[in-house]
């Protein structure tokens, strides 16, 4: 029925695109007039648009003219003009939706349309990319057109100073990675002076590779952490124990659930080994956690698939892109357990200081949009979590790539033999081949098999990270064979015949030019540096020479069928498979793709492989004989849908928990900002004092009789510990009216505070209030994050007792939050009343971040973490007023 409807009325995307026809016609109609404008007249359009917006016009009102302006500006500065399909895509992005655009169709240029339009509001636009290289490349490339039209452009990359960050965020347009934007938000909410904040309010973000950032990364929260104080010896002891255990006897592995658990026999062995009576007792929680993480490290985490060992460190491999994730660590002790497994030095565990998921960070923007080559399969998730639908943008030229049916084999061995045969055939006729594998291990096995056959090839995986650009630049040349681990997010088009820009730069390096000069030869920035001017001249000369060569080779490669894609197994996500396929057939070029599948592949083995194997066995096929059957194709797709559904469930689960923390985080960060912005916190302190009194009286009041009985001695003693030196002598057995008593207590507390303020001085007292409020809020919040994390880890057991774990987490989390708020109020007031006239009080961070990472979020991906530690001579963060070394740091 749906297919019939779409045949008559068009697909959802086709209908949505049709609605934009009229506006796109308007934009194209302006081309003739705008092309006649002088540079000065075109540049002045920006000023005119800003004036019109200030007078009440909306961005939608000026959209056709603004798009026509940036279109003409791009032509004059970059020599590129937006195609009609890019105008559609730009409008979809402006509307806060996801534009699905095929590889090589010009997403980077398309984004300039909504970026320019929205930057005119003066509130800032963030363009989010997956890595620093792409952020710098796109900023440098597109800044020429923005600068030409009078807009400022900044870039946020790892390692730049706070001052540079602030400048970049105050530009009209800011490029950067999802990690950097998220960490800056967290860091801004840890500063102790308002001027240290770098970000402006979050206005509009365009997320490139939106599926990678908002779907794949969604299970891994951003974490800023400080140094923990636990010993690392336990990791080695537990690792030695776990290595003595036998699979299926002492522990069981559930690959589908990605979990490993001790059997009853295993529990008994653990209790005997560690001399404990009951591993499930509360006092043994930490030991049980160590054992679980060591079991995971030794049985689920695979060397050269999930991580590599480099320079004595464990470096995580991104599941989806195959890139090395330098600086990231698994959380909850898993990273340390892997270090112990590999016999490396174990780093100390960390304490979480601030955390947020990408889901909740990006939902804070007033408007959010995204672009990618593959998003339609995840549209339900984009709608339910981000309220963004997906619109497929038509290609500029028809796609002529041939997607051949899957070839399914009984065994891994038979599959590999057929892959080698296919590569050999294509290589002989000069057709370039890109082979996609799902792990480093598989790519190296295939490379070894090709070497035996004498077929020259390049390998691109996390271990060859540094040579990535070089390998990709050559992947479309005649007869080249490239093996790549997960091509997602590589950010570089594969050009048939080769990339003349890269070839020219490589030749310049061979001629002795330095890396810095070479990196600047394609920059559009004006310069009076004679060496650079000369280098640019040489580059132009070489580029023309190589362009003639690659153009000739481009035609030769087209004649033999273009780039051929081979998938060595299906990924658990259809989207990743589509990304690999999308590498061929860009801009109307020919190309082909085929996936090779074995019933021994993880996906088939875990989801329906046994049934398939039974059917295939009955057919009596040879190992290297391919099977093609609708039942098999359906089985593969169903397996992928199952995994996608499970992963969506995990991400939704993570979000349900983080939504609880998110509401609490908003309250705390809001309070911090009030303190940073507030000139005078005296009224706020008085309201805290009144709250404490409101909370305290019911604690000492009995409702057993018709007239409330107040334990006056208990109440007086309690209040005297908080409001030091306040005179509460009037609290005696005569107090019958609770409301009257409240007023008297508050008045006495305010009077004592006024005496304290007179003694210290009003101006100094205002700063002391801010210092103590910040210190208490930060200390309590960081402890609360840990407590909530522990609650979450233990809450799963409630499901056994027919209690919804998420609901239990919400209720108990709320109670814990209220307790923290009460504790903040009491500690703040007590510290203020106990401050001495000669006390030295200055703003200091409770903890200083030393690591940024991703948390593991129920997945095998790493947290994004940053770390902090109190100095020996700093005031102790517990609020005692003593130096750290004399108090908690003993």
From Swiss-Prot:
Keyword vocabulary terms for this entry: ATP-binding, Cell membrane, Cytoplasm, Membrane, Metal-binding, Nucleotide-binding, Protein transport, Translocase, Translocation, Transport, Zinc
GO molecular function: ATP binding; metal ion binding; protein-exporting ATPase activity
Record-linked Pfam families: P-loop_SecA, SEC-C, SecA_DEAD, SecA_PP_bind, SecA_SW
Co-factor: note: May bind 1 zinc ion per subunit.
Gene3D superfamilies, sorted: Helical scaffold and wing domains of SecA (1.10.3060.10), P-loop containing nucleotide triphosphate hydrolases (3.40.50.300), SecA, preprotein cross-linking domain (3.90.1440.10)
InterPro entries: Helicase_ATP-bd (IPR014001), Helicase_C-like (IPR001650), P-loop_NTPase (IPR027417), SEC_C_motif (IPR004027), SecA (IPR000185), SecA_CS (IPR020937), SecA_DEAD (IPR011115), SecA_motor_DEAD (IPR014018)
Membrane topology (UniProt): Peripheral membrane protein
Subcellular location, record wording: Cell membrane; Cytoplasm
Catalytic activity: ATP + H2O + cellular proteinSide 1 = ADP + phosphate + cellular proteinSide 2
Binding site for Zn(2+): 876, 878, 887-888
Residues that bind ATP: 86, 104-108, 493
EC number per UniProt: 7.4.2.8
A GO CC annotation given for this chain: cytosol
Cofactor(s) of this protein: Zn(2+)
Chain intervals with Basic and acidic residues compositional bias: 851-872
GO BP annotation list: intracellular protein transmembrane transport; protein import; protein targeting; protein transport by the Sec complex
Annotated segments matching region Disordered: 851-873
Quaternary data: Monomer and homodimer. Part of the essential Sec protein translocation apparatus which comprises SecA, SecYEG and auxiliary proteins SecDF. Other proteins may also be involved.
Family according to the record: Belongs to the SecA family.
Its job: Part of the Sec protein translocase complex. Interacts with the SecYEG preprotein conducting channel. Has a central role in coupling the hydrolysis of ATP to the transfer of proteins into and across the cell membrane, serving as an ATP-driven molecular motor driving the stepwise translocation of polypeptide chains across the membrane.
Name of the protein in its database record: Protein translocase subunit SecA
Organism field: Alkaliphilus oremlandii (strain OhILAs)
Gene name tied to this protein: secA
